[in-house]
Amino acid sequence: LMNVAKMNDQLFDSLTSEADLNEYRRPSSRLNALRYPDVNWLDEMTDSFASTINANFNIQGGTRFVKYFASVGYAHEGSIFKGVNDGKIDSRYYYNRFNFRTNVDFNVTPTTVVSFKLGGNVGIKNKPQPQDGDDGMWKYIFGSSTAKYPMYYPSWVLEEVPDLDYPGVVEDRLISEADQTTGNPYYQMMRGRFIQLTDSKLFSDIILNQKLDFITKGLSVQGKVSLSTYYKYTTLRTEYDRPAWYLDFS
């Protein structure tokens, strides 16, 4: 289709040759499979589903004098993006939340109840930092050419194309498109920049309920003291860009 578009624009000098088209269809070597890539970025960068976990545990009981209730919960929301945690960077998208709630009611007298309520949650959000923000990953996946570059250079490439400058770096290498690194979705995911955000909330109440049936049946008075706190802060952040490489096939 690209050739058809170029012919319509009379750009005959820039047509892709039949030999090159055959290499895209059936690469003649594993090195040519990198030189003539056919990458489905959506399949390579995303899973077909995202994980979600919810767990909760409750306990309650009491006596004539005291009643109690306690609840703890955990929630996890994953992502369809294929991230990685290799001990150096964590490019996964996820959100974990831990929450708790406790209620204790004391029957101080037949007409007086003092209640203590405490609850809160802690949330941890982890995500990579593509150059164009949170929406940038979709931009790279749907905007990158399938035939411009592979996802990365496997370590075996050094067997066929030795690196005279860094011969000791025998590992998979991120790809730079001729010194321009904004086009490769895999590079954006794995470049090394990620951030972890933590938010915490705490709620506490002390409630006094006094029945006043001696004045009027059903009459009562209630007093309440509440305290709420909220914190949001960056737990971990990296600003290091992992090196990217460009392989000259000429």
Spans of model-derived segments:
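Individual transmembrane alpha-helix segments
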Residues: 187-194
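Conserved small-residue
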Residues: 1-31, 130-137
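Flexible loop and strand-edge segments within Gram-negative outer membrane beta-barrel domains
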Residues: 33-73, 77-80, 91-182, 195-197, ...
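Transmembrane beta-barrel domains of bacterial outer-membrane proteins
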Residues: 83, 108, 220-222
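Membrane-embedded beta-strand positions of outer-membrane beta-barrel proteins
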Residues: 70, 116, 206, 221-223
